[in-house]
Amino acid sequence: MDDLLDFNFYDKSTPSNQNNYSNNNSRTPSYSLPAPVAQKKNAQIPLKASKPEDPFANLFQKKTDNKISLKELERQKVGTPDSNSTPKSSNYDPFENLEILHQLSNTPRDKDAVIHDKIEENKRPISQPQVSASEKVTLKDLSLEPHQPVSLPAFENIGSETSIPFENHNEITNMNTAKDKLSSNEMYEKLRDLGFSDDQSRLALENSGSLEDAIEYILEKDNAKGQYREGEAYEAFSDSSAKTQFSDFQALSNQLKSQLFEKANDLWNIGRKKLRDAVEERRAVKDPSKPRWMDASHDFGREATPEILPKTPIPKRKPHKVPMNEKVSEDRITTNQSRSGNDESSLVDFLTSKSDNSSFNFPSDTYEGTENILETAYESTTARQVNNNKPGKSTVKKREEETLNNMVSALVEEQQSTGNELFRKGDFSQAIEEFTNSLSQLPAKHTKRVPLLSNRSLCYQKVGDLKTCLQDVDELVDIIGEEKGHGESIRDKSMNDYYVKNMVRKAQVLEQLEKYQESLNIWKDLIADGQISKLYIDGKHRCEAAISSHSSESHSKRTTQQPKSTPNHTNIKVKSERLQHVRMAQQKAEQLDEERSRLREPVQQIVNKWKEGKESNLRALLASLDTILWPECRWQKVSLSELVLPKKVKIAYMKAVSRVHPDKLPQQTSVEHQLIAESAFSILNHAWELFKQQNDL
């Protein structure tokens, strides 16, 4: 391979080629090379004398004739023709370009920069003065010279692949020199052309010596003015924001003031209304439609004040005795205090006070009654008898009874409260079960059995089980004892109240059973104990009338042979008619009780089937209410789609209650339908209470 590569050096025409090369070089601009490169170029390569002629010389000679030198390639790349160059011969020295490359590789400069310098030296004429690249290429702001457009290629790095033509360098140089020679008028015109004002241009030219300095001066001054304007704007904004905040605060304070005033006004109106209602309740408003005994209730049932009662003088020999009127007043005060704190302990108080106002229109603090006409109650403590034989509190013996466990006491109270709630809703059978469960937890003769027996006896009276009612009353009286509960209390309530209430109930039940003599004895005992009221007097008169009519009837039977023209025949006939009416009423009541007891279980099954699984779902109960009601009730069926809104549910509930309310049923309603209505009313009432809690009504 070495022989093949050295084909050009062993040719016989080598000296002539060297001469041609030297002649060609003489035409081009000369340039000096570094010393190492020149020495390498002048070095003689030894020839091999005994080298035979190469048979492939002509072949390679043709290829070398077609080669293009590196300099020509560079000229073609730049695209500028060389006017000084002449056509060179086909024979040239190949080491010329190699030496240039070797020189460039040994220099520390950048390769592109060296090539660029060589190209510029070849382009520049010999007579032209040497100008460095940094002097030729000076970037100016061409936007400042709009009237002299210059097509200058954009380049950042000198020596890049795109070289700068020689003509463009001359234009840049001429432009720079023209800028340096601009007059003040021309600079003024250029500043005006750039958009600056007259004052700005003149002031900038006075404080600067060139166009660039003038532009910088104007820009700096504008920046300073902008900062000053920003400061003024910030101060103005801060002042305006402070005023805005003050106005907002003032508006907010006015709004709060108006709201507080409105709320205070509303509260004042509410308080004034409540005060007016309280005063009206306290004030005894007289109604001209009421009879005299209702308005002057103090003549019949009010307490006697110490000023009205005659005072008994105190004997000197017994100074330790207390006057009778003071003793009565003290007992009355303590009794009223005990009653005021325990209105919720007994269920009977709630019912009697409510029904008494509706039937007799007595004041609520005068006496207590019941919801049923046949069912009356005693006047609690409003007209107590002044009894000197009544044992004082100091003489009452303390009861010795078993102490209950805390768990048992809690269970009994819970069951009692549940039974009271069921009674208020009208579910008497379930209330009886709860009271019975509570009584089973307590020992016999325990004082806590008294309120439970009292409530259960009332439930039995409601359902018509009069015999069981009498049994509970007798057990209660046996627990209270012969002292009749004077000086004793249960849960801060006088035990005598329970005694009197249940004795009144016993007298009513005996009167219903046509045991008028026993009922009369109870009424007389209550009156003898100081229970002087219209309620007890009426009971006594009824029993006396029934007894007298019964005796007169028997007497008339014995004297049937007497002439009809006797003067007392009319009175006897009237009394006998009254007695017949009373007996017929008693027979109807007994038949009604028997029928109620007979139909209770079948009706309960029907009601349980209706309410099963939906006791607390008022919508489902109303939607299926038609399954248990009778046609004469005139109930229109309601679907669940009509009971979506709580308002619609309330309307349907009010209609259902008006249909099944026990007091609003027609007189010809059968016993079975009455029982169904009572049970449905109780269940709907319970579901309505739950519905109100769930929907916040």
Curated annotation (Swiss-Prot):
Ranges where the UBA domain occurs: 181-221
TPR repeat copies, ranges: 412-445
Region (Disordered): 1-94, 306-346, 547-573
Stored InterPro entries: DnaJ_domain, J_dom_sf, TPR-like_helical_dom_sf, TPR_rpt, UBA
PROSITE patterns referenced in this protein's UniProt entry, alphabetically: DNAJ_2 (PS50076), TPR (PS50005), UBA (PS50030)
Cellular component, GO annotation: endoplasmic reticulum membrane; Golgi apparatus; intracellular membrane-bounded organelle; vesicle
Keywords assigned by UniProt, alphabetized: Chaperone, TPR repeat
Bias (Polar residues) ranges: 81-92, 334-345, 559-573
Keyword tRNA-binding tagged: no
Record field: compositional bias (Basic and acidic residues): 62-77, 323-333
SUPFAM superfamilies, sorted: Chaperone J-domain (SSF46565), TPR-like (SSF48452)
Gene Ontology BP annotations: clathrin coat disassembly; clathrin-dependent endocytosis
The organism's place on the tree of life at top rank: Eukaryota
Biased composition (Low complexity): 13-32
Keyword Magnesium attributed: no
GO terms assigned for molecular function: clathrin binding; Hsp70 protein binding; polyubiquitin modification-dependent protein binding
Classification via Pfam families: UBA (PF00627)
PANTHER family: AUXILIN/CYCLIN G-ASSOCIATED KINASE-RELATED, J DOMAIN-CONTAINING PROTEIN
Name of this protein: UBA domain-containing protein 7
Species, as recorded: Schizosaccharomyces pombe (strain 972 / ATCC 24843)
Lineage, opening ranks: Eukaryota, Fungi, Dikarya, Ascomycota, Taphrinomycotina
